């Protein structure tokens, strides 16, 4: 099954997540089909906290990709911020 989930990057104690489309059998930080955004939970000041390509997100969901709970809430947050 194709899923949309977070892949962790960054340094120890300083997480940075890529929002990726991948097969559910692949490792969390492993191979992915497409990177559609990022999430920086430790962003401060003017730093960008969340970027999500809404068109590509909608495309993959229409193709049957299942977003994780966290990605679904981030997508709703991004949609609310742009509206």
Curated annotation (Swiss-Prot):
It holds the Pfam family Ribosomal_S16. NCBIfam families: S16. Gene3D superfamilies: 3.30.1320.10. Belongs to the bacterial ribosomal protein bS16 family. One of its GO terms (biological process) is translation. It comes from Acinetobacter baumannii (strain ATCC 17978 / DSM 105126 / CIP 53.77 / LMG 1025 / NCDC KC755 / 5377). GO terms for molecular function: structural constituent of ribosome. This is Small ribosomal subunit protein bS16. GO terms for cellular component: cytoplasm; small ribosomal subunit. Keywords: Ribonucleoprotein, Ribosomal protein.
């Amino acid at each position: 099954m194709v899923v949309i989930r977070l892949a962790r990057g960054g340094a120890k104690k300083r997480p940075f997540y890529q929002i990726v489309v991948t097969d559910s059998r692949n490792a969390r930080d492993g191979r992915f089909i497409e990177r559609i955004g990022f999430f920086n939970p430790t962003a401060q000041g003017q730093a960008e906290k969340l970027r999500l390509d809404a068109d590509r997100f909608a495309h993959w969901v229409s193709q049957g990709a299942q977003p994780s709970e966290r990605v679904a809430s981030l997508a709703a947050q991004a949609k609310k911020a742009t509206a």
